Design a protein with these regions (language model features):
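Serine-hydrolase catalytic machinery in alpha/beta-hydrolase-like enzymes
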Residues: 28-34, 39-42, 60-135, 156
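Sec-dependent N-terminal signal peptides
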Residues: 4-13
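Short beta-strand/loop motif that positions the catalytic acidic residue
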Residues: 203, 208-211
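N-terminal cap/lid segment of alpha/beta-hydrolase-fold proteins
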Residues: 20-56
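Conserved alpha/beta-hydrolase "acid-adjacent" motif
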Residues: 216-222
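C-terminal catalytic histidine-bearing segment of alpha/beta-hydrolase fold enzymes
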Residues: 44-46, 222, 231-291
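Primarily recognizes the serine-hydrolase "nucleophile elbow" in alpha/beta-hydrolase
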Residues: 121-199
Length: 291
């Protein structure tokens, strides 16, 4: 009987957790950006109201979900994409190949490297189809949450890990980053291809980074942050949420707070205009700018 009650409690906790962590947001327009390992890799597109690609071009934003390089879904950034599309960007949230438990990567590749390769393909597809989408390929923003933050960083900083089928004349350079507690793991140093520290440069495009002060990944972020500053980077805007853990931006008022701060950051970079259309929560949550 006690075992049954314990099991029911675990189910209840799991259900409550799922209910709290629902990302929300409607799916965007689905496109296939490549086929790898026999499966279609898709992204979802969101357009500004009344956007006419034949009459105007706007900046593009492509985001990558988290999930430990082996899980996660597109719905993590659907709300963000819908919001930034309403503000004037063409947005995409892209999936990528994830290796399940016990599944080995192709010979000569790593579990995380496979993710990065697909992310590079997604960014290239976004740029290659700029005319149809009505975006400026020279004003692309990227980012992601947790593992997605790591993947977006390596996809734009590491010149290797390319899919041979990708167009070689299209690069993965971007003009800004939106990083939501990016996960830079210390064990990555064993593999330079996926190690952020190997690919840091002082001329990083402007970035805004969100972390909870109780996030276990924050220490590893600070290692990269310190090296970036040593290299002369001065355009990384680090924001800290007091009392918050990893993934805090996914739910409740913190999602709104981080989207507003990201909006203001993009306005500062000349990639958006006007004021955020979201309203800061009345409950008083706010981010603290880190030195």
């Amino acid at each position: 009987m006690l075992k049954l009650l314990f099991a029911l409690c675990l189910i209840s906790l799991a259900t409550d957790s799922i209910a709290e962590d629902r990302f929300g947001g409607e799916p965007g327009e689905v496109r296939v950006y490549k086929t790898s390992a026999g499966a279609e890799r898709k992204l979802e597109l969101y357009f500004p109201p009344g956007h006419d690609p034949e009459k105007s071009t706007v900046p593009g934003l492509i985001l990558f979900h988290g999930g430990g390089w082996s899980g996660g879904t597109l719905d993590q950034f659907r709300t963000a994409c819908a919001y930034f599309a309403s503000r004037g960007l063409v947005c995409a949230t892209a999936e990528y190949r994830m290796l399940g438990k016990g599944e080995k990567p192709p010979k000569g590749q790593s579990k995380k490297g496979v993710c990065v390769t697909d992310a590079k393909s997604a960014i290239r597809w976004f740029k290659q189809n700029a005319g149809e989408l009505g975006i400026d390929p020279d004003r692309i923003i990227t980012g992601g949450g947790s593992a997605g933050g790591h993947i977006s960083a390596l996809a734009t900083m590491n010149p290797d890990l390319n899919d041979p089928a990708d167009p070689k004349d299209i690069n993965t350079k971007v003009v800004a980053y939106l990083w939501f507690n990016p996960a830079f793991a210390p064990e990555d140093q064993k593999n330079p291809e996926i190690d952020i520290l190997t690919h840091l440069k002082g001329d990083i495009p402007p970035a805004i980074v969100f972390f909870g002060d109780k996030d276990k990944w924050k220490t590893d972020w600070h290692t990269a942050y310190a090296k970036w500053k040593e290299l002369g980077a001065k355009n990384i805007d680090l924001r800290i949420a007091e009392g918050q853990k990893h993934g805090f931006f996914n739910k409740g008022p913190w999602r709104t707070v981080t989207l507003i701060e990201a909006d203001r950051f993009l306005v500062k970079q000349g990639l958006l205009t006007g004021e955020p259309t979201l309203v800061m929560p009345a409950t008083g949550e706010k981010m603290v700018a880190a030195p």
